Amino acid sequence: RELAELTIGFYRRNYIEGLFLSSGVLRSPDYTTERMIECLRILREEYRFNGYIHAKAIPGTSPELVQRLGLLADRLSVNIELPSQKGLQTLAPDKSKQAILRPMAQIRDRARESKAELVKSHHAPVFAPAGQSTQLIVGATADNDRHILHLTQSLYEKYRLKRVFYSAYVPVVENSLLPSKDTKPPLLREHRLYQADWLLRFYGF
């Protein structure tokens, strides 16, 4: 409720136009998502918040909770973070490819169904009308740009993503599995990936 009150206060003062809601995992994906849903419910139903909401769907969350989240948010995102299964196994062994792709497929299918339902009835509930997106970290692993762009194209085609965002890895700790702390963030590489992404989305390269 505190976050909902803070958001509506800023919104009414025209400080913000929307909310991006994300969270680390507290206790479990379902418990965390339930708290996110309650925050959005208060905003939408009690405060009549009509601003834009982008919510993060946490891998491992039950389909029922992803459904409820999508009915309250304009856009959902399931962040892949690391662009290969090898990278996930090395740096995030608690995550799996299937746990990430499963909610992506659900969001894709449910958004398609929602559009079809709206054709039949304008009063049908709307599910994530602004679609879904994801984020990839660039430079934390040895994955090259060819691999990243192949993955990006596959995500656009198979999961109907609206955007893939790229984030240059910034070293903050010394770890033998990661680039050293004196490694500069690959900002130019990030920029070039955004340029290539533009060509994929708008020109079909």
What are these regions (language model features)?
Residues 51, 130-132, 159-162, 196-198:
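Structural beta-strand/beta-sheet cores of well-ordered domains, especially the beta-sheet scaffolds
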Residues 111, 115, 159, 197-204:
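Alpha-helix capping/termination and helix-coil
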Residues 97-101, 145, 149, 190-193:
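Amphipathic alpha-helical transducer elements in NTP-driven molecular machines
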Residues 174-205:
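Long, highly charged, low-complexity intrinsically disordered interaction regions
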Residues 145-169, 174:
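Long, internal scaffold/assembly segments composed of regular secondary structure
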Residues 1-134, 139-142, 155, 170-182:
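Conserved Radical SAM active-site core
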